[in-house]
Amino acid sequence: MPKMKTKSAAKKRFKITGTGKVKAAAAGKRHGMIKRSNKFIRDARGTMVLADADAKIVKQFLPNGL
């Protein structure tokens, strides 16, 4: 059986923590900030932990746990 390859797109966007959770940047901060509330902009700063269902999918793209 061939070696499992890591999806390059997932490698650039997600990180797996030591406890196995998946971290990602918050969405919706590329443009159009003028119509967003200040609370949204503050909350979208930094990274967030994905939900379990989403994390399960992302972990399939990262077989080596990058």
Curated annotation (Swiss-Prot):
Family classification: Belongs to the bacterial ribosomal protein bL35 family.
Keywords assigned by UniProt, alphabetized: Ribonucleoprotein, Ribosomal protein
GO function terms (MF aspect): structural constituent of ribosome
Organism annotation: Brucella abortus (strain 2308)
GO cellular component, one term: cytosolic large ribosomal subunit
Name of the protein this chain belongs to: Large ribosomal subunit protein bL35
Gene: rpmI
Keyword Ribosomal protein: yes
Lineage: Bacteria, Pseudomonadati, Pseudomonadota, Alphaproteobacteria, Hyphomicrobiales
Listed Pfam families: Ribosomal_L35p
GO biological process: translation
